[in-house]
Amino acid sequence: MLDINEIKNKITLGDSLEVMKQLPDKCIDLILTDPPYGIDITRTGKMGNNNCAMANDYGPEEWDKEIPAKEYFDEMFRVSKNQIIFGGNYFVDRMNINSSCWIVWDKNNTGNYAPCELAFTSFPGVLKKYSWTWNGMLQENMKEKEIRIHRTQKPVGLLKMILADFYDANAGGIVADFFSGSGSTAIACAEYDIPFLAVEKSEHHYKNSLKRLKDAQAQTKLFSGLEVLRSVQNRR
C-alpha cells in the first residue's frame, strides 16, 4: 500500500492506474480530472465538430488516440468519494453516468473553438453552468493570462470556481487529478491551499506542468486560501 503523504501536494510522473491500485478505498475526497477523450485531437486538431488552435508546440505525444481503459475509471471510483470528470459524455461505456448534476462550461467562443464542454459529477442537484472565456488569445482574466501548454488545458480560474462550489473546505479532504496534463487542477488546489495529488504519465507534460506549479506556489499570499474558501462557503 502506498503512503499517500509521499505523493501529496505534488505532481507525480507515472501511470495513474498503477498509483491508484496502491491506494486504499475512498481515501480521496474529490477527483477533478480531464482524461483523454479518444478523439485523436493531436492529429486532427478537432474537438467535436470544431477546430482547435494548433499553433503552439504542445508536445510530441499522441496522448488522445484512445480513451483510458475501464479499469482506470473503476479505480477512480474506488479510491474517491466524489468525482468531477470532464468529457464524461465520451465515457458512457466506461462508467455509470446517471447524474442530474452535470457541469456545462461555456467558453464564450465566437471562433472555431468548441463553444462549451461537459463534465460529469457524482453530486446530487441540477445542472450547473460556468462561463469562462477561453477563446484563443482571449481569456477571462487577461491580467493574469495563462500560458497554454496543453491542447485541452483547463483554466485555473474555472477550476477554482468549481472547487468553491463542490469541495468541502471544512472537511479538508484531498483532491486528486489522475490525468494531470497541464497541472491546472494542482495549481487551483495550491492557490486554495487544498491538499492534492496529481499524476501525469507524459514526461513532456509532467516537466512543463511542474514548472507551472512551482511558479504558482512561489506566489506570496496574505491569507490562507483554504481559510478564505471556508469563510465563503460558511456564508452561503
Q: Where are the regions a protein language model picked out?
A:
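Class I S-adenosyl-L-methionine
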Residues: 23-32, 37, 41-59, 77-236
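Conserved SAM/SAH-binding loop
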Residues: 14-18, 226-229
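Extreme N-terminal starter segment of soluble prokaryotic enzymes
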Residues: 6-10
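Blade/loop signatures of beta-propeller domains
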Residues: 1-4
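Short hydrophobic/charged patches on amphipathic alpha-helices used for structural packing
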Residues: 17-20, 73-74
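A short acidic, glycine-rich active-site loop
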Residues: 55-70
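Short, conserved SAM-binding segment of the class I
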Residues: 68-75, 79
